[in-house]
From Swiss-Prot:
PANTHER family: GLUTAMYL-TRNA GLN AMIDOTRANSFERASE SUBUNIT B MITOCHONDRIAL AND PROKARYOTIC PET112-RELATED (PTHR11659), GLUTAMYL-TRNA(GLN) AMIDOTRANSFERASE SUBUNIT B, MITOCHONDRIAL (PTHR11659:SF0). SMART domains: GatB_Yqey. It is an enzyme of class 6 (ligase). Keywords: ATP-binding, Ligase, Nucleotide-binding, Protein biosynthesis. It comes from Mycoplasma mycoides subsp. mycoides SC (strain CCUG 32753 / NCTC 10114 / PG1). Pfam families: GatB_N, GatB_Yqey. This is Aspartyl/glutamyl-tRNA(Asn/Gln) amidotransferase subunit B. InterPro entries: Asn/Gln-tRNA_amidoTrfase_suB/E, Asn/Gln-tRNA_Trfase_suB/E_cat, Asn/Gln_amidotransferase, Asn/Gln_tRNA_amidoTrase-B-like, GatB, GatB_C_1, GatB_Yqey_C_2, Gln-tRNA_amidoTrfase_suB_CS.
Length: 479
């Protein structure tokens, strides 16, 4: 931006994909009846004690490794003290002094093709707060979310545009999704983004007052929020005024940021060590084992799909936009070697059905076994693309029959026996002798007419390539 350099730091809160909460055995499940998944620990009953969720620590280690972070094997927790209705204990268990991950990085590719490494300052484990629902001038609290395991991932203030912020969050989301660390559904709050934005004159190394924008729930809103806030701050600075340090929220309706509160003084959270959780020394062999079993990331799959399976970059990218689609593709290619055909069918007719019904592929009846069977039958010349159009609607909506059973029941097998095709053609030629008189002047029309009658008699169940070879021979025999 003219005259000013944009400084952006990103903080992401990511809900961990665990069955129970971070420090209690309460079940984790989105969308349940409010306040039905909170126990005595979540509600801070006197005398209750936290216990660390081992799975949550494993997921944090996976995330640290994928983000090229230094992993601290001494696990400690701290208390962040503040009073607010969504926090029954009066404090949050977090990792202020000793985060599990430090000094990481993530590479993004800009629209112009240039690469940029985004430095990540820290990753720490903490617990979520209760969900607040504002309605009819009242605030309702749902403690189902209270205590759910989170990792907070904080970048250094190294991003310089809305594009970089969006690409960073998109890439981070992809990594965490393919690691199965989180379902990262921004619309459900399992990936929440806060931005810290400030402007400074070009050439200056001093940071100006930053404005924090809270809880952005989509990539498009991140873009809009950054662009609006940059323009708002620029207008203030061009008037020789000072940008006030504030916390703001993004308004979907007006595509603008709105003041929540001013930060005149920094809040003192009086951090101190969590006395109810002793330091835990993680076994390095256990950490190494978790890392060695890390799932294949999308970037690794992308390279394999193109270099080993022969997919185009475009097809590989489309497959990898959905974890469900990727998993389905992986299962299917174990059952057939026509990898390109699998990809083409997934991203064309199958994706069209998913878009129409607003579903993911795991929500329909289609199985990898049935899709692979269709492709294998085509490759073996048992059915053609025409028969496929009959079979596909059935297997997309039902899994009670195998493809082979459907083909048999509907008599869809291609006739490939040359003797059988010859007999059929001879009968048609004998019934259309007058056509042969036109063969010398209009051969294509004669062949097309006879082939049309052949397809009509067999419901299209004749291999057209074999039939085309035979029809010319049979016509010439009868001239």
């Amino acid at each position: 931006m003219q005259n000013f350099e944009i400084i952006i730091g990103v903080e992401n809160h990511v809900e961990l994909k665990t069955n129970s909460k971070m420090f209690s055995p309460s079940k984790v499940s989105y969308g349940q009846t409010p306040n039905t998944l909170a126990n005595e620990i979540d509600l801070a009953y006197p005398g209750t004690l936290p216990s660390v969720n081992k799975k949550g620590v494993e997921l944090a280690i996976l995330a640290c490794n994928a983000l090229n972070m230094q992993i601290d094997t001494l696990l400690t927790f701290d208390r962040k003290n503040y009073f607010y209705p969504d926090l029954t204990k009066g404090f949050q268990i977090t990792q202020q002094f000793n985060p599990i991950g430090k000094n990481g990085s993530l590479e993004i590719i800009l629209e112009n093709g240039n690469k940029k490494v985004i430095e990540i300052e820290r990753l720490h484990i903490e617990e979520d707060t209760a969900k607040q629902v504002h309605k009819d001038n009242l605030t309702y609290l749902d403690y189902n979310r209270s205590g759910v395991g989170l990792i907070e991932i904080v970048t250094k203030p190294v991003l310089r545009s809305a594009e970089e912020a969006c690409l960073y969050v998109e890439k981070l989301r992809e990594i965490l999704l393919f690691l199965n660390v989180s379902d990262v559904k921004m619309n459900e709050g399992s990936l929440r983004t806060d931005l810290n934005i400030s402007l400074r004159p070009y050439g200056s190394d001093k940071f100006s007052n930053k404005v924090e924008i809270k809880n952005l729930n989509s990539i498009s809103n991140i873009k809009k929020a950054v662009e609006f806030e940059i323009n708002r701050q620029k207008e203030i600075l061009l008037k020789n005024q000072i940008v006030e340090q504030q916390t703001r929220r993004f308004d979907d309706q007006t595509s603008s940021t709105i003041l929540m509160r001013s930060k005149i003084d920094s809040i003192d959270y009086r951090y101190f060590r969590e006395p109810n959780i002793f330091p835990i020394q993680l076994d390095q062999k256990w950490v190494d084992q978790i890392i060695s079993n890390s799932p294949e990331l999308a970037d690794q799959k992308r390279i394999r799909y193109v270099n080993e399976l022969g997919l185009t970059s475009e097809d590989a990218n489309i497959i990898l936009t959905s974890l469900e689609m990727t998993n389905f593709f992986e299962k299917t290619i174990k059952l057939t070697t026509n990898y390109n055909k699998v990809a083409k069918m997934l991203i064309s007719e199958i994706q069209a059905k998913l878009n129409l019904e607003n579903k993911t592929i795991d929500q329909i009846k289609l199985s990898p076994e049935n899709l692979a069977s269709v492709i294998n039958l085509i490759d073996k010349n048992i059915i053609s693309s025409k028969q496929t159009k009959v079979v596909m609607p059935i297997i997309l909506d039902s899994n009670t029959e195998t493809v082979e059973q459907i083909v048999e029941r509907l008599n869809l097998k291609l006739i490939t026996n040359k003797d059988e095709i010859s007999k059929l053609l001879v009968n048609i030629i004998n019934q259309n002798k007058e056509l042969l008189n036109q063969y010398s002047t209009r051969p294509e029309r004669v062949i097309k007419t006879i082939m049309g009658q052949l397809m009509k008699q067999t419901n299209g169940n004749v291999d057209p390539e074999i039939a085309n070879e035979i029809v010319i021979k049979e016509i010439e025999k009868n001239l």
